[in-house]
Amino acid sequence: MQRYELIRLIGRGGMGEVYLAHDKACSRRVALKKIREDLSDNPLLRKRFLREAKIAADLIHPGIVPVYSICSDGESVYYTMPYIEGFSLKHLLKSVWQKEILSKELEEKTSVKAFLPIFDKICATVEYIHSKGVLHRDLKPDNILLGLFGEVVIVDWGAAIFKHAKELQQEKDEEGFSSYGQKNICYSSMTVPGKIVGTPDYMAPESLLGAEASEKTDIYALGLILYQMLTLSFPYRRKKGRKLPYEDSILSPIEMAPYREIPPSLSQIAMKAIAVDPVQRFSSVQELRKALQPHLQGESEWTTRDILSTKDRKNWKYYEPILLSRYFPVLASSPAQWYNFMLSDMEVNSSVRVECSVTKSSVQEGVGIFFPPSKEADKGEFYCGYGLWFSSQNNELSVSLIKNGIEIQKESQGIIPQQSRFAISIEKSNNKITVFVDQILFILHIDYLPSLGERIEIIIQDLQGISNITILESIGALRVSCLAVPDAFLAEKLYDQAARFYRKIRDSFPGRKESYEAQFRLGVTLLTQIEEQGGDLMQALSTFDLLHGSTGAPLEYLGKALVYQRNGSFVEEIRSLLLALKRYPQHPEIPRLKDHLCFRLYDSLHKHRSEALVFMLLILWIAPEKIGLREEERFLEFLHHRQQSTLFCRIDKTPLQFKSSKMELFLSFWTGFTLFLPELFQRARDLRDYQALIDIFYVVCASGNKEVFSQFAEDLAIFVDEVVFPKSLHNQRGEELVLFVQGLAALQNREYRQAKEFISAVPFALQLYALDLFSLQAFIDEEVKVFSDFLQDIYNSASAEDHKHVLVYMIQVSLWNQDLKQAYELLSKNFPQDKGLIEYSEAFVLWGCYLALTGDRSAVKAHFSRCQFKYGRSALIGKCIDDDSLDYLEGLVWWEKKKTLFQSYFLLRCLHAPKERYEVYRQAYISMENSFFG
């Protein structure tokens, strides 16, 4: 241990001691964990201690501290990690135990709202280790470290083991592990290094009775941690050494701490996680996290106002059959369709939730739930306001959002053929509408224009096909605001009257929320009025300028984002939202901006799919808690074909998870939005995630941002010099990464001889990254001979199995050299057309280029006209044959546009088009800005 100078003891556990130490070689502080001296002679505990270090070293996740080095030479047994400043969760909980009065700061830190994101991060880490086949077996507040900068990490992997490892049985045999009867169970808060693996207080009942550990034993420990977060106390605290009679009932969190205002559903989650019977617990950590999602997303508390029966006429003001086409022509599939029509007698306010269930047969015929304003409904104008139309066909459920009789949004998803009923939940809260079917989010819509009192309207053919309708209202929604009067004018489109009252309220309440809210709504009023009159929308910006520096400052940027959105200035819209989030991250109005981001994501999925990727990235970075598990699956499916077209996703076979650094990098690559790359680079560097670092350098090179590339390269050189571990894989991979980066730098500078020297010294996978980047540069710069030689060298040194990865580049070279014979042989042998080519694949485009080289223009047009997706990249490439306008590319995301320009240029070269034609695409490619903002 000569390299390390121990500074002070940080903590002591069942097997080890953790010290703050100074690393003399790297001149930095580290955390050094060594086996306790009184246990160092025990070979089994030494083995378990080293196993702990190796398991932690194999796991790469933000919630796990990476391992720098492991030493087991001679008597010294220790390993080192980054030192994270902070405190344990136990320390935080202990600071409030049995205290009746808390400081404001401590009350905020230990609130249920503050604890939930921390608990979700803990669960995310446990979900990750379970996916890797690892059980922690000693989860407790003492082993949760809360960093000063928001880090939440799980430490102490001494009890961790692989789920199906033989060591489970060996532990029983070697430690004399015996079956503990219920009467012999005692409790303590320290890990027992001998008979029992884990901390008894946090062990599941079956573990204390001798059963093997499982995912459900970790879930039990998570449940206890959640219970403590909710109640600030332990569910069955006993004096040390006292037995726990399981017959005693455990109080629910609500009963244990009624003053904490714990939502009943959250209390139920904790109780389910700590059920004595493992069968009654959550089946997985993923299921536990899914149950937490509504609470993480900040859903309101609702109370039941009324339950309406569709069979009781007393609930309804109108109750009669109607011809659907008369009132809702957009919905009727046949002009002769008659439906039962019901309009509620009761009026609901602006915050309402409607819940019911409908049969599959009813949905096949179509079911409508509408919210017409009372004034229009009383006049028989039932189509006014918002409504939802539910329909299904061919095992696909569709939900349409209707406004004033016009469909403005439609979402569809597949359904299980055997499903007989659907549970519907519609929430209208102020200016936001969310629609769930079987807890799956279908619609999220925000309208900044206020709505007045509304009624409930039901349209259905068979009354037997719908359950009773539960009407819930948000607690506190009945409070009347001084803004209600101008809101009413705005809802009636009386813009001048609304503006006059908003100004009056703004001036009457200086410094208060009513003032800045009135100014924001004044801006929305003027923006709507200008838009309706066909004026210059940018005039509305000055109204939002008045919010600058006020107590409602973030709303300045939200308002400007609305102006830019309606004006079609997407980049400026994003810039405005980012300014608000960067300048006021803790402002009370920031959740409002996060809601707006979510709305824009779902809205762009429906209207501007290229914009959706940017909003996905922003939400992942800023508000990942807003995306539920089901939405993650939906978005992954949406991104699937782009994933197949992304080199680093094909090389690195690790599954692309939605909430991951790899997904953030993936979206940065496709959008050209590189703002978050420095943080991703730092994260990958700190975790020693070499694959991520490789991918990041590839993305930076593809973006063309030489300044960022140079900065990352300098940081990498320093980082690799600091890492000096004898016989370590880190050294080898670090050296390979440095050579790879030097090769990319040489390619950027057109120093091809040096590039070849560096790239030839790295593994084939890294060569493939360089080859892909070089191919774009070589064909655009018309330096194909150099690229061809580079390609041939890599091909000659690669294995037969790896040859398939360079076929696309070989075909490109053959086409460029007009070698029809070789191009045809390579295409027909490796990508035969009769096997069905995927239209977004590279091979599909190359076949089109081959046909172009034969001179058969009509065959080329026929080839690209086969594309099923008329606005997909391959279909758009075919447009360059007859059209020199680049307007049709505007709907593409950044990388799609860049790639389409390259392939269009290549196709026109193969088609022997005049130089001035293909030069248009070449220059457009070269002139593309190297980042999202330019």
From Swiss-Prot:
Matching entries from InterPro entries are given as: Kinase-like_dom_sf (IPR011009), Prot_kinase_dom (IPR000719), Protein_kinase_ATP_BS (IPR017441), Ser/Thr_kinase_AS (IPR008271), Ser/Thr_kinase_PknD (IPR023507), TPR-like_helical_dom_sf (IPR011990)
**Annotated EC:** 2.7.11.1
Query: For binding ATP, which residues are annotated in this chain's numbering?
Result: 10-18, 33
Q: Which residues form the active site?
A: 138
* EC class (word): transferase
Task: Tell me where on the tree of life, at the top rank, the source sits.
Answer: Bacteria
Instruction: Using the record's annotation, list all stretches that form the Protein kinase domain.
Output: 4-296
The UniProt catalytic activity note for this protein reads: L-seryl-[protein] + ATP = O-phospho-L-seryl-[protein] + ADP + H(+); L-threonyl-[protein] + ATP = O-phospho-L-threonyl-[protein] + ADP + H(+)
Q: Does the keyword Transferase apply?
A: yes
**Among its keywords, does the record have Kinase?**
yes
Tell me one GO molecular function of this protein: protein serine/threonine kinase activity
Give the matching Pfam families.
Pkinase
Regarding how it is modified after translation, the entry says: Autophosphorylated on serine and threonine residues.
Q: Which UniProt keywords apply?
A: ATP-binding, Kinase, Nucleotide-binding, Phosphoprotein, Serine/threonine-protein kinase, Transferase
Instruction: Give the family this protein belongs to, as stated in its UniProt record.
Output: Belongs to the protein kinase superfamily. Ser/Thr protein kinase family.
Describe its function. Answer: Together with the serine/threonine kinase Pkn1, may play a role in the specific interactions with host proteins during intracellular growth.
Protein name, please?
Serine/threonine-protein kinase PknD
Organism listed in the record: Chlamydia muridarum (strain MoPn / Nigg)
Gene that encodes it: pknD
